[in-house]
Amino acid sequence: MKEIQIPRKSFARSSELGAKRLKDPEMKNRKVTTEKRQIATFSDVSFESTKDPMDFSPISQISGAISDSEAESVIQGSSLDLMSTPEICLPADDSPVSTITSVEARIDTSSTDRIQSIVDLPASVQSLRGEINELKKLICSVDNSAEINWVDRVVTVKFRIVLLSFILWAILAAIVVFFSSGEERAYRGPLPT
């Protein structure tokens, strides 16, 4: 018996396809165009980044220089200094526009009340959560005990009815099978063909 050989199709390898793509002049033009766009974009970004020099020192060096107690004392001292200082300078630049001079540098009492309420917020939230949990327990204990008793009674009665129905059906089926199996009747009806 002679085997029939099916000619296999030769598939081009991926490297050959890449070479064909590069030989295509339209593809070359697209590649050159995209490279030009990328170079223009990245040169704009690099120009902007050199325009604004910034201090990029690691956070660990900055945070290591100031301890927690020093930071707290600076924060507390700065709030007192703000009330007594008539002149406030912004650190961005030393132009006359950035310097604010005012004799009436006051802190509104409502803002200090807001700050105090923000400080006391976690304690009040915890106390509210505790009260809510106690109320939930009280309400659930009253409602659940009455509701659970009612549900238990309904389920128990339903289970008893289903069980009684099943037992009666089993007894009736047993009686029918018991009495009908012993009799032999003569066949009455059309004869089989």
UniProtKB/Swiss-Prot annotation:
Q: Where is this region: Disordered?
A: 15-35
The listed location of motif Required for nuclear localization is 190-193
Query: Where, by residue number, does the polypeptide cross the bilayer?
Result: 161-181
As for membrane topology, the entry says: Single-pass membrane protein
Tell me the compartments it is located in: Nucleus membrane
Q: Which UniProt keywords apply?
A: Membrane, Nucleus, Transmembrane, Transmembrane helix
Q: Name one GO cellular component term.
A: nuclear membrane
Basic and acidic residues composition bias: which ranges?
18-35
Which residues are in the KASH domain?
A: 155-193
Which superkingdom does the taxonomy of this entry point to?
Eukaryota
Oligomeric form and interacting partners: Interacts with SUN1 and SUN2.
Q: What is known of its domains?
A: The KASH domain, which contains a transmembrane domain, mediates the nuclear envelope targeting and is involved in the binding to the SUN proteins.
What protein am I looking at? Answer: Protein SINE3
Q: Which gene encodes it?
A: SINE3
